[in-house]
Every structure is written in structure tokens, then in C-alpha cells.
Amino acid sequence: MAAKEVKFAGEAREKMLRGVDILANAVKVTLGPKGRNVVIEKSFGAPRITKDGVSVAKEIELEDKFENLGAQLVREVASKTNDLAGDGTTTATVLAQAIVKEGAKAVAAGMNPMDLKRGIDLATAAAVKDIQARAKKVSSSAEVAQVGTISANGDSSIGEMIAGAMQKVGNEGVITVEEAKTAETELEVVEGMQFDRGYLSPYFITNAEKMIADLEDPFLLIFEKKLSGLQPILPVLEAVVQSGKPLVIVAEDVEGEALATLVVNKLRGGLKVAAVKAPGFGDRRKAMLEDIAILTGGQVISEDLGIKLENVTLAQLGRAKKVILEKEKTTIVDGVGEKAEIEARVAQIKAQIEETSSDYDREKLQERLAKLAGGVAVIRVGGSTEVEVKEKKDRVDDALNATRAAVEEGIVPGGGVALLRAKKAVEALSSENPDIAAGIKIVLRALEAPIRQIAENSGVEGSIVVGKVLESEGNFGFNAQTEQYVDLVAEGVVDPAKVVRTALQDASSVASLLVTTEALIAELPKKDAGMPAMPGGGMGGMGGMDF
């Protein structure tokens, strides 16, 4: 086991704080409509330009092990917020930095870290409750567009495009973002289907950066039983190899020899293949496999129908323009099924929905209907250069996540105002214990951090903006884009309540743990053993010398 270095108390916190500051300072320049870009060096290809907080956070790795520990913990805040809400990563980072800074000062002044944490947790819970109470449900397409626009850094065309996509496939519909081959950004609604099963083995991945298997124009083998032996599928595999097209296998399970053979063939490049478990269970699985077969113009290969796997021909396989397999979901885009058959299936499911008395069955049937009839909306992001396309795609992804979050939990005034207004709820808290009271005050100060940063990124003094916004009530706040004090909701400057709430909860959770840290342990750098011994003769004695 390698030797470790340990740092305690003040020295540990100081190092950790320095790491937190380096990461947070790099991330927070991107906050708000007038936030700046960050350029990230890539080991190959052009540098990446981004205004996406989590992309910046993920790139930062510090040389000093102890500073790096602090930076990694704040990176965790950004990643977790991104996973849960899909946006708000920069806000979460700014909040975490503010709580850690104030908390470290309080600990240095001799306060009890555990009581400080209790105060921070109490204040966070009160602020979250206030944010949820202020949330206003999103009803119109225009409001959806506003949320998307703000999250895409004021790009109204992106906001309108996402609102259009949601209108076409419904709020629950599937919307994917791709890079376009042209300079234009466009929206296309493709008939497709998504289900919640992912690839059976990570070896099927074709795009390592996104961790997905992306197969163009594949055949689909839809089999209702388990596949474990290799012999039954050999004829169909050989036919697919000769056709030169990829193959997607949808079956109850693929295991043993069959899975091993598919993986080996994929790795050797002989056959582009991916396997996925069939969605659903029991009778519902059969019905969903039938849906996939109708959508792709294939047949469900079932022993009940007297079709043996050994005798399957290419004509019995489904076809689609594209199949994308992720870790936990699969999307089939543009199946070649007959329109009349798909419509007949949709009518059949609608009839079943009307007949069923079980709420659970009705919900599952509606899900199947949405998958068959709703389709998949694809936003193709275009630009003049690859760098521009990547930067814009980051913003479209953020905007899409923010819009989904807004539909889920409603919207609050943007520009850091919802957090600032939550101060009132936190001020109402009190505690006999002075250290818990100090923890509450830490959150009170931290709630101002995002609006200050947005103002400073716009070239305006943060404290003046905070003072002016606190003089008023409700949705009144600072619009950094126009540098005016206005009713933010009326102007369309809104944030999803879920994003603001998640950012605060994640920041407070990690930052309060940092405040209670008393020791840091990191591995010592390995020392070079020096030059190897030289062969006998001339300069033989140099082997052990240290350079």
C-alpha cells in the first residue's frame, strides 16, 4: 500500500478551500446572460468553447492532491445537480462556494462544525419550502419557450424550438438532440419509440464519449424467449453479415455463449451488433414486442407461432433508420412499418384503454400509445464550425432539461431572485444555540451569491443590485440582459423551481460536509528510483545516484 500524507484542522481546510475556489471561480464566470465562455484544451482536435458549468467543472484536475479533494467535492455538486435537474450547475457551484467560505470562517472562529451543519440544514429546508411555495405551474407554450430561452443563454430560437417539439410529441414525449450536417438548426419529428432497457453489455458501445451504441439502418431480430446458445442464431447472423448492415437483437435475455459470441464479433469488427432486453414483463412484454415489430415492419419470432429461430430469414426481421442504445434506454427511430398497420395498432390500444377498469393498466396502455403515436422529436443543432456546434449543443441540452424540469415542478422568477426572496423564510428561523444560529446566517449570506455573481458578470456592482431587489417584493428583480429592474416573470426571465431547489439542496449537502471536515488523507507522490545500474565498465557506480 502506498504511503499517505495527512493534514489536519486549519491547514486541511485552507488547502481544501483553495481547491474549491479554483474550481468555483472557473465555473462562475459562465453564470447569467452575460456570463463569459471558458476554453478547454482537448488532447486531440480543436479546443472546446463552452458556457456550461458542469463541462468546465468536469475538466478541472489540480496538481496539489489536497486542493484537488476540495475541487472534486464541488465538482460532485455540479454533476449531481446536472443528473437530477439537468441544469443549474453553475448556480449550485456558486452556492457551494459561498457556504464553504462562510463555514470555514465560522469554524476558524471556534464554532462547533456539527452545530453549524445543523443550522445550514435547517435553513436549506426552509428556503426549499419557500421556493416550492412560490412556483407557478407552466401552462402555455410561450412559457415553455421562455424557460428554454433563459437556459440557452437568451437564445430565443432554441426556446421556441423546444416549445415546438414539446407541442408535437407532448410533455412526456421523447426529444433528442443531435449534431446537424448543415449550418442550420432545425426541428424534425420522427416516428420512433423509446423503452426503458439499455444495452446488455458495455462492449456494444460505438460512441465511447457519450457511452451509447448508435446503429444506422439496422435489422432488428425480435425474439420473445431467452437466447443462450449460439447454434439457433447462426443462420440469421450469417445472413446479416452478408447484407453488410448492423443488427439489434431484442429478446427476453441474451446470455452465455450467444452473448459472448456477439461481443467478440463486435470487437473484431466482423458484425456491428447490439443486444437489449425486451421491455415489460409477462403479457405486457409480448404486447410491447408486437408494438416494436409493427413499428419496424418485422415479426415477433415466437415458438408459439411455430417460427423456429433457425429458419428466420431477413424478411422477418424489423428495419429502422437508426437505433440508439444507452445504458438504461433504447430509442428506435423511423421504423419501416406499414402506416396502416401502425394506425390499426393505435386504434386497438385506444379501444383497450376505454375498456379497462384498472388505472395501472390504463396508464401502461397510454404509455404504449404515446410510444407508437407520439414519435420522437429530433433537434438538429447546426453551426459553421465543429466548435460552434458543440457549444450550441451544450446550450440546447441545458435548455431541454430546464424545460422538462419547469413542466414538472413549475417556474419561479429567475436571475437569482427566487433564492434571494427565500431569505425571508430563513430569517424567520431562530435557535437558542449560537452555533446553529450561525449556520442559519451562513445560508442567509449564501442565498445572495448567485444574484451578486450574475450582476458582476454583467459589469454591475452586486451589493447595489441585492439592496435594490430586497427593497421590493414578489417577482421584481434585475434583468442582467437589459440591466433594468423589472417584473422578471412578465419579462420571461424565469427558472424552473426544480433546478433552483436542486441546486440549493446539493450545494448545501456537500458544502456542509466540507465544513465538518477535520482531516484530509492523500497519497504521497511516488519517488523515482533513479537511473538503473549501468553495465560494468566505465561509469559503473552511477546506478544509485538520484537526479
UniProtKB/Swiss-Prot annotation:
Keywords: ATP-binding, Chaperone, Cytoplasm, Isomerase, Nucleotide-binding
The keyword Nucleotide-binding appears for this protein: yes
Chief localisation class: cytoplasm
E.C. no: 5.6.1.7
Chain sites annotated for binding ATP: T30, L31, G32, P33, K51, D87, G88, T89, T90, T91, G415, D495
Any single GO BP term: protein refolding
PANTHER family: 60 KDA HEAT SHOCK PROTEIN, MITOCHONDRIAL
UniProt function note: Together with its co-chaperonin GroES, plays an essential role in assisting protein folding. The GroEL-GroES system forms a nano-cage that allows encapsulation of the non-native substrate proteins and provides a physical environment optimized to promote and accelerate protein folding.
Protein name: Chaperonin GroEL 1
